[in-house]
Amino acid sequence: MVKSTGGSFLNGGKGPSSFGGAFSCNSNKTELTVGYATFYGDICGALAPIGDLWKHHVYELGRYLNDKVFQRQVLPEAIFTIRPSAELSSEQTVGTGGDPLVYPYHDKLFRSFLEQWRKTSPAEILLWYSEGTLAEHLGCEADIISEAFPDARSFIADLEHWWKLMHTLAVAKRIQAPPIVSITRRAYGYDHREAQLTPYFPREYHRLKAQLLND
């Protein structure tokens, strides 16, 4: 393997197997939940080593590597401080942000959908939101929710958007994703059996939604 003058590594057109290795899928659990990966692109790999880590866990792991393992700043500070971006349009760029995910909130929301023994439903999320107890149930700061969603309409739109995405295209991507190193009580794959079906909202959800929007 030869290092170029620009600092990158050139492998002479050889794949990772030429060096007795394989390339990894670097999608984290938050990204896998909503399908933030490209078919036959960054979702490819032999193994997804951080596929069971939520976004905030990835940041914590990076800090741990710098502080405890390497005891120096191997990972640049910008890795932790730069505003994330989905880069889905010209308005969403690294540095300016534009990522529709509010990770301190959405990590906890998605975790409630997946990791609890009795998985939380959208109806329960709406009930807790109407009672003012959502932050307590999810384990996040209440200010994060109120700042991200100024009213019930924006909160509901966000909830439905991610719930639908989680159960449609994201399922197809997870099915084709590589094996995940499992560290939580429920990882995608064998721990979480799923089928690509139409997202479902029960009657209670629609009742609570109408109540919140009409108040």
What are these regions (language model features)?
Residues 1-215:
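ATP/NTP-dependent adenylation/nucleotidyl-transfer catalytic domains that generate, transfer
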